[in-house]
């Protein structure tokens, strides 16, 4: 069980809110109506499944009017991440070599799909900055992804839905690695 942090903004004074979460049209969480102007909340001890799509629904009351909103979200990988690090295994011979200019590294994977998938997610992380492309289109709107963390304590990964980028037949995924703090 994990906490969920939810935030929203309201263009007028908020009097109350009510949150619900659905999976496949089934309600998996329904909170009580809360009289509050809070717009950042923590929901503790949710029993959500890993790598699963949900819809968060919110009902906001403001000046006796009711507003509705919803947002899709996907839970991440729970527990130990079993991915494999990709590296060129170059070792630094001298520390000053770390600061030399280098071209960005490109990682490429070609594969074929017999049909376009209904869902396709990628979980990706870089120890430094990266951009992700599928079939020549940049995935997401962020530039130079990856949040900095103390890598000995934890590493954040990003999740992208690739369904709209993939095609039946030949596909190409490539990642451009930035010349950053994990240069070698």
Task: Tell where the protein language model's regions lie, with residue ranges.
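Low-complexity, Pro/Ser/Thr- and charge-rich linker/hinge segments at domain boundaries
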Residues: 73-96
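Beta-strand-rich interaction surfaces with strong enrichment in secreted/lumenal proteins
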Residues: 30-33, 44-46, 96-99, 109, ...
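Recognizes extended acidic, P/S/T-rich segments that occur
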Residues: 14-53, 63, 67
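Aromatic/hydrophobic beta-strand junction motif of beta-rich domains
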Residues: 6-10, 124
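Surface-exposed coil/turn segments at beta-strand junctions on protein surfaces, enriched
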Residues: 34-38, 47-51, 100-102, 115, ...
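Structural beta-strand segments of beta-rich domains
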Residues: 2-6, 118-120
């Amino acid at each position: 069980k994990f906490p969920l942090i939810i935030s929203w903004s309201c263009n007028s004074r908020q009097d109350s809110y009510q949150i619900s979460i659905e999976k496949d049209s089934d309600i998996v969480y329904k909170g009580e109506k809360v009289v509050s102007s809070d717009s950042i909340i923590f929901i503790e001890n949710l029993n959500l499944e890993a790598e699963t799509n949900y819809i968060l629904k919110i009902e906001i009351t403001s000046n006796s009017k009711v507003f509705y909103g919803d947002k899709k979200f996907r839970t991440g990988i729970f527990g130990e991440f079993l991915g494999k690090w990709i590296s060129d295994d170059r070792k630094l011979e001298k520390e000053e070599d770390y600061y030399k200019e280098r071209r960005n590294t490109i990682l490429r994977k070609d594969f074929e799909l017999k049909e376009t998938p209904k869902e396709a997610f990628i979980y990706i992380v870089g120890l430094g900055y990266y951009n992700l492309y599928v079939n020549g289109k940049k995935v997401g709107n962020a530039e130079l992804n990856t949040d900095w963390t103390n890598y000995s304590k934890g590493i954040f990964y990003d999740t992208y839905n690739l369904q709209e980028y993939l095609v039946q037949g030949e596909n190409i995924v490539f990642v451009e690695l930035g010349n950053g703090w994990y240069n070698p």
